[in-house]
Amino acid sequence: APAESRPALRMVPEMKDLAQKLLERGFDVWAFSLSGQHAALEAAKLYGLHPTRVVGLRNKILNGALTAETLNPVPEGYGQAEAVALLIGRNPVLAVGKPQDAALLDTDDGDGLRVLLAAKDGPDAAAARAKGWVVQPPFSPVRDPQQPDAPNAP
């Protein structure tokens, strides 16, 4: 019998709702991911994001072959902030990220809203609040068809 597999891409309903509301109100919504560019593009479809607004890890192509060399900016740490400056040209009005995205969240000239996805009483929460960031507990992704797994039927 063939092996069953689950979809590797998971969507976070609250983030999709936020992205959709921002898009409906005319905001330019971008996604930065350390996932490969192709996987990031597929995931962005779940959120309704335009493919030109998705930045994933990109590898150099040499003589038609994919190499192990990554292209800058690498969308992680300070590379995220570099990508924002390079591709958007200004600090974001809203940035949402995890503790490892602190460099991106720090790209604030005082006018933007920053949301850290972390435990409210976790080690990063106090530092985030001291910077004026909102601390939001992380959301749980759900699997296709975008509903929590049902308990096993007897």
Language-model segment annotations:
Residues 1-154:
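C-terminal cap/substrate-recognition subdomain and adjoining C-terminal extension
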